[in-house]
UniProtKB/Swiss-Prot annotation:
PANTHER family: CORE-BINDING FACTOR SUBUNIT BETA, CORE-BINDING FACTOR, BETA SUBUNIT. It holds the Pfam family CBF_beta. Regulates the DNA-binding properties of Runt. Its main location: nucleus. This is Protein brother. It is found in: Nucleus. It comes from Drosophila melanogaster (Fruit fly). The gene is Bro. GO terms for molecular function: transcription coactivator activity.
Length: 213
């Protein structure tokens, strides 16, 4: 008795690539587009006004400096002032338990109407202002910290100007992505006959149906 093997069986036994997988190697590679995660949500103002966390943070409440908690108070005071002059500070909004790493422009500009880090505005206090994106919304921290107690009061405001800038960038990003996807479909979309159609139409080596007789 003779045993016959088809090409697929022989290829599998020899560790070769089966015919159908070998054919896939000749397909034209398609481009891969990476859509960067948006920095902001589509309607920032609406989220700022309706989100419970933002509503709580928008009301002025107690804040505390949280850096170097294990150090003596005198050293913490010195480090807080040094950090502020370098352009950053670790602040906690006590009521909500929200910890913030603030960054701001510590360079004193005599022509600016308001400083991001102002030691001169009020004796014994530093007034801070810092803009950042929180939960997809552009906000601005505004408040003060007592240089002796290392606590104070602050709130979060909606940063209208930066929100508009981020919205414009978001729309450009979406438009660019859609254009690239449309161009990709136009270039690389080639109609292909489904594999099962070979059986219905009588592919190579297969008998044709009644209509082909």
């Amino acid at each position: 008795m003779h045993h016959h093997q088809n090409l697929g069986d022989a290829a599998a036994m020899n560790g070769m690539i089966p015919p159908y997988e070998a054919m896939a190697m000749y397909e034209q590679p398609k481009p891969r587009f990476i859509f960067k995660m948006p920095r902001v949500v589509p309607d920032q103002r609406s989220k700022f006004d309706s989100d419970e966390l933002f509503r709580r943070l928008s009301r002025e409440s107690e804040v505390r400096y949280t850096g170097y908690r294990e150090r003596a108070m005198e050293e913490r005071r010195m480090r807080f002032v040094n950090d502020c002059r370098k352009g950053y500070a670790e602040i906690s909004m006590v009521a909500s338990g929200t910890n913030l790493q603030l960054y701001f422009n510590a360079n004193h500009n005599p022509y600016a109407q308001e400083q991001d880090c102002d030691f001169e505005r009020e004796r014994g206090k530093v007034h801070l202002r810092s803009s950042f994106i929180m939960n997809g919304v552009c906000v601005r921290f505004r408040g003060w910290v007592d240089l002796d107690r290392l606590d104070g009061a602050a709130c979060l405001e909606f940063d209208e100007q930066r929100a508009q800038q981020e919205d414009a960038q978001l729309q450009e990003q979406i438009q660019s992505y859609n254009q690239r996807m449309a161009e990709s479909r136009r270039i690389y979309h080639t109609p292909q006959t489904p594999p099962e159609d070979h059986h219905h139409r009588g592919g190579p080596g297969l008998p044709r149906g009644p209509m082909g007789w």
